[in-house]
A protein has these predicted regions:
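Charged, low-complexity interaction regions
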Residues: 16-28, 43-50, 100-109
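A structural signal for well-ordered alpha-helices, especially hydrophobic packing surfaces
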Residues: 18, 39-43, 63, 67, ...
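Short terminal alpha-helical segments
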Residues: 1-40
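Amphipathic alpha-helical binding modules
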Residues: 73-138
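Short, charged early-sequence alpha-helical segments and their helix-coil boundaries
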Residues: 45-81
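Generic structural concept
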Residues: 11, 32, 36-39, 53-60, ...
Length: 139
């Protein structure tokens, strides 16, 4: 199966999402970037259709060598600066409360941990969009 149309349809699904919260919009933005990266890897021959067949292999392809989403985030594979992460995931009032990311988001996490949570959710959205598009194309 050629995944070019599947990935294009999954991208369309993600781009058409109407998220209401700042967190949801941020997670969707991460998902769109992640799917674009996966599509580029597929187009350039770095990953095959088999790599996108199951959750585990697709996640390994998306992680690009990292062990998990925390390592992906802390390793610099996504946004690096606290202010950029805060701007991507927070409402204006949360940005003000954290002084545009200068303060920690909460007592238990750093901004890179928050980003790792968002990336994990983004991959869930990516994989469910790929799975739905694959079923649609097969019919």
């Amino acid at each position: 199966m050629d995944y070019t149309t599947v990935l294009a349809q999954a991208m369309q699904t993600l781009e058409q999402r109407k998220d209401r919260s700042a967190w949801g919009r941020g997670v969707t933005a991460y998902a769109v970037d992640m799917l674009q990266q996966i599509a580029d890897y597929y187009k350039d021959g770095y990953i095959s259709a088999d790599d996108l067949a199951t959750w585990t292999t697709a996640e390994a392809a998306a992680l690009n060598g990292a062990r998990d989403w925390s390592e992906y985030s802390w390793g610099g594979s996504a946004l690096v600066y606290d202010g950029d992460i805060a701007a991507a995931l927070c409402t204006p009032s949360e940005l003000k409360k954290t002084r545009n990311g200068d303060r920690r988001p909460n007592s238990r996490e750093e901004w890179l941990d928050v980003q790792a949570r968002a990336l994990r959710q983004a991959f869930r959205r990516v994989y469910s969009a790929i799975r739905a598009a694959r079923q649609e194309v097969q019919q």
